[in-house]
């Protein structure tokens, strides 16, 4: 798609060509106990365990950050259009990659998601009353898998953390990432040529699809 300012600080319009799509999963975590009345709360209640699990994941960021070739190519192509300081960093990832791994997720959630598997906690349920300790509390999350830590490895990492906090984990739905396109191949070059003929002068760059599309159904 044609995207204005694809990364914060880089002005202008760019033709961003999706070259792979992250996988995704919907995951449910359940904590159980005997329940009880809020006037005499027990230790380590279901909601407390779920909260400790969320804090653990958010604080320790269990997924590995990496500049995949497609992401490196994106930064290299966008670098000439960035202000000097940003251009210097983006055009020399061989030197600044460790710094960018730390800074990028803080500057742009979208760009940060291109470096690693992500998990977002989205749903929660517990007791139906303020004064009742739940016998069961649940937590829902959405995961997006990156190629260097795909579906199986990413789910295994989260499962280990869930078990550490005494939680059950159910994978409600999952599918792995789509295979990356060869950004140096003829198919990608042909797309570039068509964009150049249709929109003369518009910069073209590979792009990571962090959201889900129907692209997975077109894989051989």
Role assignments for model-derived ranges:
Residues 2-220:
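Metal-dependent amide/peptide-bond hydrolase catalytic core
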């Amino acid at each position: 798609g044609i995207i204005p300012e694809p990364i914060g600080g880089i002005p202008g319009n760019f033709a961003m060509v999706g070259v792979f799509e992250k996988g995704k999963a919907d995951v449910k975590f359940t904590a159980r106990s005997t329940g009880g009345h809020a006037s005499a709360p027990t230790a380590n209640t279901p909601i407390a365990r779920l909260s400790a699990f969320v804090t653990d994941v958010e604080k320790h960021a269990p997924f590995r950050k990496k500049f995949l070739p497609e992401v490196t190519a994106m930064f290299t192509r966008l670098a000439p259009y960035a202000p000097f300081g940003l251009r210097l960093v983006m055009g020399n990832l061989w030197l600044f990659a460790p710094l960018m791994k730390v800074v990028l997720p803080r500057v742009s959630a979208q760009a940060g998601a291109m470096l690693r598997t992500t998990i977002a906690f989205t749903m929660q349920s517990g007791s139906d009353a303020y004064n009742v300790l739940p016998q069961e509390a649940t937590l829902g999350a959405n995961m997006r898998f990156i190629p260097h830590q795909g579906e199986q490895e990413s789910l295994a990492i989260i499962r280990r953390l869930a078990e550490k906090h005494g939680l059950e984990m159910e994978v409600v739905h999952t599918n792995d990432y789509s295979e990356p396109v060869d950004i140096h191949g003829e198919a990608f070059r042909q797309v570039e040529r068509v964009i150049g003929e249709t929109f003369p002068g518009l910069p073209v760059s590979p792009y990571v699809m962090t959201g889900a599309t129907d692209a997975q159904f077109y894989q051989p």
